[in-house]
Protein backbone atom coordinates (compact mmCIF):
# COMPACT_ATOMS: atom_id res chain seq x y z
CA UNK A 1 0.00 0.00 0.00
CA UNK A 2 2.83 2.39 0.88
CA UNK A 3 4.56 1.73 -2.44
CA UNK A 4 1.31 2.40 -4.29
CA UNK A 5 0.91 5.72 -2.48
CA UNK A 6 4.47 6.74 -3.37
CA UNK A 7 3.86 5.77 -7.01
CA UNK A 8 0.62 7.80 -7.12
CA UNK A 9 2.36 10.83 -5.60
CA UNK A 10 5.19 10.51 -8.12
CA UNK A 11 2.69 10.35 -11.00
CA UNK A 12 0.85 13.41 -9.67
CA UNK A 13 4.14 15.32 -9.46
CA UNK A 14 5.17 14.19 -12.92
CA UNK A 15 2.31 15.95 -14.75
CA UNK A 16 3.18 19.54 -13.71
CA UNK A 17 6.91 18.85 -14.22
CA UNK A 18 6.34 17.59 -17.77
CA UNK A 19 4.00 20.52 -18.49
CA UNK A 20 6.63 22.96 -17.23
CA UNK A 21 9.34 21.34 -19.38
CA UNK A 22 7.05 21.45 -22.42
CA UNK A 23 6.46 25.20 -21.88
CA UNK A 24 10.22 25.80 -21.61
CA UNK A 25 10.90 23.86 -24.84
CA UNK A 26 8.13 25.67 -26.76
CA UNK A 27 9.34 29.03 -25.39
CA UNK A 28 12.92 28.35 -26.53
CA UNK A 29 11.76 27.14 -29.95
CA UNK A 30 9.38 30.06 -30.61
CA UNK A 31 11.99 32.70 -29.72
CA UNK A 32 14.62 31.07 -31.93
CA UNK A 33 12.30 30.38 -34.89
CA UNK A 34 10.73 33.85 -34.82
CA UNK A 35 14.14 35.42 -34.11
CA UNK A 36 12.69 37.54 -31.30
CA UNK A 37 15.26 40.03 -29.91
CA UNK A 38 16.54 39.37 -26.40
CA UNK A 39 15.38 42.81 -25.20
CA UNK A 40 11.78 41.74 -25.98
CA UNK A 41 11.83 38.09 -24.88
CA UNK A 42 14.96 36.19 -23.82
CA UNK A 43 15.17 32.42 -24.16
CA UNK A 44 15.37 30.11 -21.12
CA UNK A 45 19.03 29.47 -22.08
CA UNK A 46 19.72 33.24 -22.01
CA UNK A 47 18.22 33.40 -18.52
CA UNK A 48 20.35 30.48 -17.30
CA UNK A 49 23.49 32.06 -18.80
CA UNK A 50 22.93 35.45 -17.13
CA UNK A 51 22.12 33.72 -13.84
CA UNK A 52 25.59 32.16 -13.98
CA UNK A 53 27.55 35.17 -15.29
CA UNK A 54 25.83 37.67 -12.95
CA UNK A 55 25.62 35.22 -10.05
CA UNK A 56 27.43 37.40 -7.48
CA UNK A 57 25.26 40.45 -8.16
CA UNK A 58 22.08 38.37 -7.99
CA UNK A 59 23.25 36.67 -4.80
CA UNK A 60 24.09 39.96 -3.04
CA UNK A 61 20.73 41.51 -3.93
CA UNK A 62 18.89 38.33 -2.93
CA UNK A 63 20.48 38.49 0.55
CA UNK A 64 19.19 42.05 0.99
CA UNK A 65 15.65 41.06 -0.01
CA UNK A 66 15.80 38.00 2.25
CA UNK A 67 16.91 40.15 5.19
CA UNK A 68 13.98 42.55 4.70
CA UNK A 69 11.53 39.69 4.14
CA UNK A 70 12.48 37.62 7.19
CA UNK A 71 12.57 40.59 9.58
CA UNK A 72 9.24 41.88 8.24
CA UNK A 73 7.65 38.46 8.68
CA UNK A 74 8.98 38.04 12.24
CA UNK A 75 7.68 41.51 13.15
CA UNK A 76 4.25 40.73 11.68
CA UNK A 77 4.09 37.35 13.43
CA UNK A 78 5.00 38.76 16.85
CA UNK A 79 2.56 41.69 16.62
CA UNK A 80 -0.25 39.51 15.20
CA UNK A 81 0.13 36.84 17.90
CA UNK A 82 0.31 39.44 20.68
CA UNK A 83 -2.70 41.37 19.42
CA UNK A 84 -4.62 38.14 18.77
CA UNK A 85 -4.11 37.02 22.37
CA UNK A 86 -5.16 40.44 23.70
CA UNK A 87 -8.27 40.43 21.50
CA UNK A 88 -9.18 36.96 22.77
CA UNK A 89 -8.79 37.92 26.43
CA UNK A 90 -10.41 41.37 26.15
CA UNK A 91 -13.57 41.20 24.04
CA UNK A 92 -14.02 45.01 24.06
CA UNK A 93 -10.68 45.46 22.28
CA UNK A 94 -11.67 42.82 19.71
CA UNK A 95 -15.00 44.54 19.05
CA UNK A 96 -13.25 47.90 18.62
CA UNK A 97 -10.31 46.78 16.49
CA UNK A 98 -11.66 43.95 14.34
CA UNK A 99 -13.90 46.10 12.06
CA UNK A 100 -11.12 48.69 11.66
CA UNK A 101 -8.62 46.00 10.69
CA UNK A 102 -11.03 44.57 8.11
CA UNK A 103 -11.66 48.02 6.58
CA UNK A 104 -7.91 48.73 6.52
CA UNK A 105 -7.48 45.85 4.08
CA UNK A 106 -9.39 47.78 1.41
CA UNK A 107 -6.33 50.07 1.17
CA UNK A 108 -3.92 48.66 -1.46
CA UNK A 109 -0.60 47.94 0.23
CA UNK A 110 1.30 49.32 -2.75
CA UNK A 111 -0.13 52.79 -2.06
CA UNK A 112 1.37 52.73 1.44
CA UNK A 113 4.92 51.98 0.20
CA UNK A 114 5.67 55.53 -1.07
CA UNK A 115 4.55 56.96 2.29
CA UNK A 116 6.81 54.55 4.18
CA UNK A 117 9.74 55.57 1.97
CA UNK A 118 9.04 59.29 2.55
CA UNK A 119 8.74 58.78 6.32
CA UNK A 120 11.59 56.30 6.87
CA UNK A 121 13.98 56.83 3.96
CA UNK A 122 15.49 54.51 1.37
CA UNK A 123 17.13 52.00 3.70
CA UNK A 124 15.75 48.63 4.88
CA UNK A 125 13.15 49.87 7.41
CA UNK A 126 10.34 50.86 4.97
CA UNK A 127 10.72 47.52 3.14
CA UNK A 128 10.58 45.61 6.43
CA UNK A 129 7.43 47.52 7.40
CA UNK A 130 5.91 46.85 3.97
CA UNK A 131 6.45 43.10 4.43
CA UNK A 132 5.09 43.31 7.99
CA UNK A 133 1.92 45.07 6.82
CA UNK A 134 1.42 42.47 4.08
CA UNK A 135 1.84 39.53 6.47
CA UNK A 136 0.12 40.96 9.54
CA UNK A 137 -3.55 40.81 8.56
CA UNK A 138 -3.78 37.18 7.28
CA UNK A 139 -1.92 35.92 10.37
CA UNK A 140 -4.01 37.93 12.83
CA UNK A 141 -7.39 37.14 11.29
CA UNK A 142 -6.63 33.42 10.96
CA UNK A 143 -5.37 33.28 14.55
CA UNK A 144 -8.38 35.16 15.97
CA UNK A 145 -10.73 33.01 13.90
CA UNK A 146 -9.07 29.87 15.25
CA UNK A 147 -9.37 31.09 18.85
CA UNK A 148 -13.05 31.96 18.42
CA UNK A 149 -14.17 28.76 16.69
CA UNK A 150 -13.46 26.27 19.46
CA UNK A 151 -15.92 23.42 19.98
CA UNK A 152 -18.33 24.53 22.73
CA UNK A 153 -18.33 21.07 24.26
CA UNK A 154 -14.61 21.42 24.97
CA UNK A 155 -15.12 24.90 26.40
CA UNK A 156 -17.91 23.63 28.66
CA UNK A 157 -15.67 20.78 29.80
CA UNK A 158 -12.95 23.23 30.83
CA UNK A 159 -15.54 25.37 32.63
CA UNK A 160 -16.78 22.29 34.49
CA UNK A 161 -13.20 21.61 35.56
CA UNK A 162 -13.05 25.23 36.82
CA UNK A 163 -10.10 26.06 34.59
CA UNK A 164 -8.99 29.68 34.55
CA UNK A 165 -9.11 31.74 31.38
CA UNK A 166 -5.33 31.41 31.05
CA UNK A 167 -5.42 27.63 31.52
CA UNK A 168 -8.21 27.32 28.95
CA UNK A 169 -6.18 29.40 26.51
CA UNK A 170 -2.92 27.46 26.97
CA UNK A 171 -4.34 23.94 27.07
CA UNK A 172 -7.34 24.26 24.73
CA UNK A 173 -7.60 27.38 22.59
CA UNK A 174 -3.97 27.71 21.54
CA UNK A 175 -3.47 24.06 20.46
CA UNK A 176 -6.85 24.02 18.67
CA UNK A 177 -6.08 27.24 16.77
CA UNK A 178 -2.70 26.08 15.39
CA UNK A 179 -4.18 24.79 12.13
CA UNK A 180 -5.94 28.08 11.37
CA UNK A 181 -2.85 30.06 12.39
CA UNK A 182 -0.68 28.17 9.92
CA UNK A 183 -3.24 28.78 7.16
CA UNK A 184 -2.75 32.51 7.70
CA UNK A 185 1.02 32.14 7.87
CA UNK A 186 1.03 30.22 4.58
CA UNK A 187 -0.94 33.01 2.88
CA UNK A 188 1.50 35.58 4.29
CA UNK A 189 4.70 33.85 3.17
CA UNK A 190 3.26 33.48 -0.34
CA UNK A 191 3.24 37.26 -0.77
CA UNK A 192 5.99 38.54 1.53
CA UNK A 193 8.92 38.27 -0.93
CA UNK A 194 6.82 40.05 -3.56
CA UNK A 195 5.97 42.78 -1.01
CA UNK A 196 9.67 43.38 -0.28
CA UNK A 197 10.46 43.44 -4.01
CA UNK A 198 7.67 45.94 -4.78
CA UNK A 199 8.88 48.21 -1.96
CA UNK A 200 12.38 48.07 -3.48
CA UNK A 201 10.96 49.01 -6.89
CA UNK A 202 9.47 52.19 -5.47
CA UNK A 203 12.56 53.28 -3.59
CA UNK A 204 15.71 51.50 -2.62
CA UNK A 205 19.42 51.12 -3.20
CA UNK A 206 19.77 47.32 -3.00
CA UNK A 207 17.64 44.21 -3.37
CA UNK A 208 15.99 42.18 -6.11
CA UNK A 209 13.46 44.95 -6.78
CA UNK A 210 16.24 47.48 -7.42
CA UNK A 211 18.06 44.89 -9.56
CA UNK A 212 14.89 44.41 -11.65
CA UNK A 213 14.36 48.16 -12.15
CA UNK A 214 17.95 48.68 -13.28
CA UNK A 215 17.80 45.65 -15.58
CA UNK A 216 14.52 46.87 -17.08
CA UNK A 217 16.00 50.34 -17.69
CA UNK A 218 18.89 48.69 -19.55
CA UNK A 219 16.45 46.45 -21.53
CA UNK A 220 18.21 43.43 -20.00
CA UNK A 221 15.10 41.28 -19.82
CA UNK A 222 17.16 38.15 -19.21
CA UNK A 223 18.19 39.68 -15.86
CA UNK A 224 14.58 40.67 -15.12
CA UNK A 225 13.45 37.08 -15.71
CA UNK A 226 16.34 35.69 -13.63
CA UNK A 227 15.45 37.88 -10.64
CA UNK A 228 11.74 37.08 -11.05
CA UNK A 229 12.52 33.35 -10.94
CA UNK A 230 14.48 33.90 -7.71
CA UNK A 231 11.45 35.63 -6.16
CA UNK A 232 9.23 32.69 -7.16
CA UNK A 233 11.72 30.11 -5.84
CA UNK A 234 12.11 31.96 -2.52
CA UNK A 235 8.33 32.11 -2.11
CA UNK A 236 8.03 28.37 -2.77
CA UNK A 237 10.83 27.64 -0.28
CA UNK A 238 9.08 29.67 2.42
CA UNK A 239 5.78 27.88 1.77
CA UNK A 240 7.59 24.54 2.01
CA UNK A 241 9.23 25.55 5.31
CA UNK A 242 5.83 26.56 6.72
CA UNK A 243 4.38 23.17 5.73
CA UNK A 244 7.28 21.38 7.44
CA UNK A 245 6.94 23.51 10.59
CA UNK A 246 3.20 22.86 10.66
CA UNK A 247 3.67 19.08 10.48
CA UNK A 248 6.26 19.14 13.27
CA UNK A 249 4.19 21.34 15.60
CA UNK A 250 0.90 19.52 15.00
CA UNK A 251 2.66 16.19 15.57
CA UNK A 252 3.86 17.34 19.01
CA UNK A 253 0.94 19.49 20.14
Where are each of the predicted segments found?
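Transmembrane alpha-helices
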Residues: 129, 133, 166-198, 226, ...
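C-terminal transmembrane helix and the adjacent membrane-cytosol boundary/short C-terminal tail
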Residues: 91, 148, 183, 225-253
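Short helix-to-coil transition segments within interhelical loops
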Residues: 147-153, 157-177, 217
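Periplasmic/extracellular loop-to-transmembrane helix junction in inner-membrane transport proteins
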Residues: 33-74
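Transmembrane alpha-helical segments of polytopic membrane transport and secretion proteins
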Residues: 1-21, 240-253
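Generic hydrophobic transmembrane alpha-helix motif, especially the helices
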Residues: 102-138, 145-146
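Transmembrane-helix boundary motif in ABC transporter permease subunits
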Residues: 72-101
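Glycine-rich helix-loop "coupling/hinge" segments at transmembrane-helix boundaries
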Residues: 118, 194-231, 250-253
